[in-house]
């Protein structure tokens, strides 16, 4: 899967933002989620993620050995992918980055959000315990939390989201 060139176009993104998709954040939570460059998703703009140039140690699956129990887009616009293994399994950072948020966060429960150098953000929620704090530098594959059932969760798992400037997209495009 390493030899993948991902092209995100504005032609695909309006499907997730045209009102058919339920917002993943409440109005109160939106104060923490801002689009840094609003014109980024204007018609004709493209974002390229050259994953084929990454070395094996530069990325990691968030929950090795995990099973997808709820895919992106299911259940009325699910904004991420739910991955399950055993309770308190180790959650790993997908890429190098800086922890932007590590705290209890409404329906997400214990959440870790990591901002990566390419503008990508990854989100890991429902954690039993966060192992990193806001401002920490993390490496791909580093332990950042333990799977849990905090917030609005019905079983122990990690809810994994990928976002660029606040706009979520299918994590399967990366992994």
Label each residue range with its predicted role.
Residues 70, 85, 101, 126-129, ...:
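A residue-level detector for short acidic-glycine micro-motifs
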Residues 134-175:
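Conserved, short, structured surface segments that act as functional micro-motifs
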Residues 84, 90-94, 124-125, 135-138, ...:
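Small beta-strand-rich domains/subdomains or short beta-sheet motifs embedded
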Residues 64, 87, 95-96, 108, ...:
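Short, flexible surface segments
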Residues 1-8, 12-71:
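Polar/charged, compositionally biased leader and regulatory segments
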Residues 78, 94-131:
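Zn2+-dependent peptidoglycan hydrolase active-site motif and core
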């Amino acid at each position: 899967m390493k030899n993948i060139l991902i092209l995100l176009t504005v032609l695909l993104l309006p499907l997730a933002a045209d009102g058919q998709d339920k917002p993943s954040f409440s109005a109160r939570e939106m104060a923490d989620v801002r689009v840094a460059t609003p014109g980024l998703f204007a018609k004709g703009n493209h974002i390229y993620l050259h994953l084929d140039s990454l070395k094996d140690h530069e990325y990691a699956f968030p929950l090795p050995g995990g099973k997808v129990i709820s895919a992106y887009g299911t259940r009325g616009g699910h904004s991420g992918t739910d991955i399950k293994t055993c309770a308190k399994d180790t959650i790993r950072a997908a890429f190098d980055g800086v922890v932007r948020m590590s705290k209890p966060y409404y329906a997400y429960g214990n959440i870790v959000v990591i901002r990566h150098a390419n503008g990508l953000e990854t989100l890991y929620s429902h954690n039993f315990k966060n192992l990193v704090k806001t401002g920490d530098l993390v490496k791909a594959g580093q332990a950042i939390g333990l799977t849990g059932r905090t917030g609005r969760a019905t079983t122990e798992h990690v809810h994994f989201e990928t976002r660029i400037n606040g706009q979520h997209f299918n994590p399967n495009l990366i992994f």
